[in-house]
Amino acid sequence: MPETKNIEKQEQEQEAINPLKIVFKKPYVFEGKTYNKIDLSGLEDMTGEDLIRIEKALRMTGVKSLNFEMTPEGAFMYAAQAAGVPVEFFDLLPIAEARKIRIVVINFLWS
């Protein structure tokens, strides 16, 4: 048990150091693979072309917004590209984790 608490503490410290690496409270299973965290550091490498492509895709799905990244769909499209996972990854993610990811994306794009 002490080892588990130590690992959790290390993960929390890592999250504080790099807010783009989000550690989940509980393991999340997607398409048979278990995830304990998601790394959104890929946001730092995205370009204006990515922004245009994502916003066009969102318009095509019927999402209407002046700030697409503020919508869950938009934030998850940015997160999916950054993390290298399909956007469907976020569909069944627990709501607390989903909101955390959305906030991280918004904060990154608006900072």
Language-model features: where?
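Short, surface-exposed, charged amphipathic helix/loop patches that serve as local interaction elements
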Residues: P2-S111
